[in-house]
């Protein structure tokens, strides 16, 4: 029989899933490390168990003890599972900006939840850092986890997450992208990957209101960078010991709005139901798209499950109240409705062959290629006129009768500019995708978009 002795043994070995739609404008292969398949539905399960086991080995956590931690919810869930299996009590201290779902889930697995105000300084006695420390002092036989400065956090990812990514990509990974909060994931994974290949780029996603990016670039801890933000799970107003800035190559900041808008898109367009930090990561990658090239293998880590955010980022009323609504300025990417293969003709192809293609696929215009180069276009009106004037000439090639090539746009060309390119004499526009292939937008696509 094959079974696990307890739920903690199921942690790890999470899948890599190719992203297909959201990252279409990124020329690289983009793979999501989906950590929601861990039993606590987040990457934090890995380090929660590691921190508890190391505390046990070092005599810091004794039988029947109480585990105390300040958490955004996910570490608390991992700790809760470990405490259930190992027989400890758990007190989780959360800031009031965390979703109600996170608090309810922690209570459901036996944790005592203490809620603190968000908009106070880190050293304020009301902050969740200060309250966690105070509770640890006041509670007999307790242990304060301190995931920010507890280096077992990043060791967990050095020992498990990093090796998994290296093995799953067969060592072909070129970039690792992840949101940064405590710094354990990026530092542990980053160190492992850099040891395997120093050329791998380690990229942290930060948020506005956090100190990470400026500190990384200037070495200055600037309190002016600190202000309230909505994004959950990433960014800090402190410098955790787990953040190894020497390993990180670049920080990219993402706004609350961009992260919020992207979060439900991951579920709707990729079928992957994940949380707000994943939205930040994808939005950040799109901002950095010029950093990646064809042949790169980019792994982006999705921290946690979308169920923790159904009352916020997946709630249209909540999003609308905060102005987190995507502006209605569609681009060529939005007009591409299918992912079927483009029907093309070769310049030396016969007229009869092109007629067969038009009939088979129910289309009225076709781009003409010579090798890999677009050299012209052909449509049913041109063919009709030519055959009317030149009967019995279906065997002739289209090279002598084709029109100019359709204009070429990129995925970000606006709907307005696409519309201007389509005229009576020019019935279609070619759109070049990030992978070098083409798609076609016709008059019918424009009509469908505005009707």
Locations of regions flagged by a protein language model:
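A short, polar/charged loop-to-alpha-helix boundary motif
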Residues: 380-399, 446-451
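PLP-dependent amino-acid enzyme catalytic core
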Residues: 1-331
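Short hydrophobic beta-strand motif reused across regulatory alpha/beta modules
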Residues: 364, 376-383, 438-446
């Amino acid at each position: 029989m094959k079974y696990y002795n307890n739920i903690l043994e199921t942690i790890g070995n999470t899948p890599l899933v190719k992203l297909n739609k959201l990252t279409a404008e990124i020329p690289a292969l983009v793979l999501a490390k989906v950590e929601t398949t861990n039993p606590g539905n987040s990457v934090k399960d890995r380090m929660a168990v590691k921190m508890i086991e190391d505390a046990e080995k070092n005599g810091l956590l004794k039988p029947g003890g109480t585990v105390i931690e300040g958490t955004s919810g996910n570490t608390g869930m991992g700790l809760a599972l470990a405490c259930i299996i190992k027989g400890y009590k758990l007190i989780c201290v959360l800031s009031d900006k965390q979703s109600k779902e996170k608090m309810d889930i922690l209570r459901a697995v036996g944790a005592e939840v203490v809620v603190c105000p968000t908009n106070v300084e880190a050293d304020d006695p009301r902050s969740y850092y200060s309250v966690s420390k105070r509770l640890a002092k006041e509670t007999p036989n307790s242990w304060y986890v301190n995931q920010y400065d507890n280096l077992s956090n990043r060791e967990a990812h050095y020992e498990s997450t990093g090796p998994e990514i290296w093995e799953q990509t067969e060592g072909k990974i070129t970039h690792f992208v992840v949101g940064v909060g405590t710094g354990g994931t990026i530092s542990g994974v980053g160190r492992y990957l850099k040891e395997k290949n120093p050329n791998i780029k380690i990229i942290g996603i930060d948020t506005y209101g956090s100190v990470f990016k400026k500190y990384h670039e200037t070495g200055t801890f600037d309190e002016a960078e600190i202000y309230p933000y909505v994004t959950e799970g990433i960014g800090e107003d402190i410098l955790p010991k787990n953040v190894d800035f020497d390993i990180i190559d670049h920080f990219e900041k993402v706004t609350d709005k961009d992260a919020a808008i992207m979060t439900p898109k991951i579920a709707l367009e990729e079928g992957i139901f994940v949380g707000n930090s994943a939205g930040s990561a994808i939005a950040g990658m799109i901002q950095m798209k010029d950093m990646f090239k064809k042949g790169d293998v980019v792994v982006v880590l999705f921290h946690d499950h979308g169920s923790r955010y159904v009352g916020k980022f997946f709630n249209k009323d909540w999003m609308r109240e905060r102005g987190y609504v995507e502006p209605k300025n569609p681009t060529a990417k939005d007009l591409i409705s299918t992912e079927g293969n483009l029907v093309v003709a070769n310049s030396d192809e016969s007229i009869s062959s092109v007629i067969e293609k038009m009939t088979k696929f129910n289309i009225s215009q076709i781009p003409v290629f010579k090798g890999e180069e677009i050299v012209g276009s052909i449509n049913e009106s041109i063919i009709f006129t030519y055959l009317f004037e030149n009967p019995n000439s279906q065997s002739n090639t289209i090279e002598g009768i084709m029109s100019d090539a359709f204009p070429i746009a990129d995925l970000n060309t606006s709907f307005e500019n696409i519309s201007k390119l389509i005229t009576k004499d020019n019935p279609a526009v070619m759109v070049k995708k990030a992978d070098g292939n083409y798609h076609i937008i016709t008059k019918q696509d424009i009509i469908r978009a505005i009707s």
